[in-house]
Regions:
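Conserved N-terminal beta1-alpha1 strand-loop-helix module at the mouth
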Residues: 1-87, 93-95, 102, 110, ...
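Generic enzyme active-site microenvironment
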Residues: 32, 172-173
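Short gly/ser/thr-rich secondary-structure transition/capping motifs
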Residues: 113-117
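Short glycine-rich anion-binding loops that position phosphate/pyrophosphate groups of nucleotides
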Residues: 138-140
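Acidic, divalent-metal-coordinating active-site segment for phosphoryl/phosphodiester hydrolysis
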Residues: 176-188
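Acidic, Mg2+-coordinating phosphoryl-transfer loop and its flanking beta/alpha structural elements
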Residues: 190-195, 200-201
Length: 220
């Protein structure tokens, strides 16, 4: 099932609660929340207290993407803040197995992400323990970047590996996703699409979400 996860990174941080409610009414499935520490990536966004403050404004799945150096230290903070899905990077400094285990034992779904320069095969040893893999189609850290089409073989390789091992997980793509770019990742097996400016910058967010869902669904 296709899911659209608008990224709050493209929204107005001064109205996060209102915008979370708005995109839910517009037909979004998840709310993607990018947490950046200024170390793992150059930018700084927000942390667990902000996420907690908007949790009661929306019933959407809170999809928390930790672009931080030591995710293990902060997992429980984001669990308590109301995260439903917690994604961390294979390139982070935290032990992967221990971090996944803590996320799942705390009642959240666990996901691993790979930067553009990281082989997707790096997550293969952990697939049995994951609910999702996030393939970055831009360099993480800033919104509004151009979609990297050369990341598409990663989606195909991941989907093939999952099918070979009878593993059923979500494949998420994040970066430059819009109605113009969603077709190819959907055709290759992606199921969750993070869209920032394509939703928050649209004159009609509901129309933008519906259009992306329709295009992606027709490619499955």
């Amino acid at each position: 099932m296709i899911k659209i996860a608008p990224s709050m990174l493209a929204g107005d941080f001064s109205q996060m609660g209102e915008q979370a409610a708005m995109i839910e009414k517009a037909g979004a499935d998840w709310l993607h929340l990018d947490v950046m520490d200024g170390h793992f990536v150059p930018n700084i966004t927000f942390g667990a207290p902000i996420i907690k403050s908007i949790r009661d404004k929306s019933s959407l799945v809170f999809d928390v993407h930790l672009m931080i150096s030591e995710p293990l230290r902060y997992i429980l903070d984001f669990v308590k803040a109301g995260a439903d899905v917690i994604t961390f990077h294979i390139e982070s400094d935290s032990p992967v197995d221990e971090t996944i285990d803590l996320i799942r034992s705390s009642g959240c779904k666990a996901a691993l992400s790979v930067k553009p320069g990281t082989p997707v095969e790096s997550v293969f040893p952990y697939l049995d323990k994951l609910d999702m893999v996030l393939i970055m189609t831009v360099e993480p850290g800033f919104g509004g970047q151009k979609f990297m089409a050369d990341m598409m073989p990663k989606i195909s390789a991941l989907r093939e590996e999952c099918e070979k091992r009878s593993i059923d997980i979500e494949i998420q793509v994040d970066g430059g996703i819009s109605a113009k770019t969603i077709e190819e990742p959907a055709r290759r097996g992606a199921t969750v699409f993070v869209a920032g400016s394509a939703v928050f910058g649209a004159d009609d967010p509901a129309k933008a979400i519906a259009e992306m869902k329709d295009i992606a669904a027709n490619c499955q």
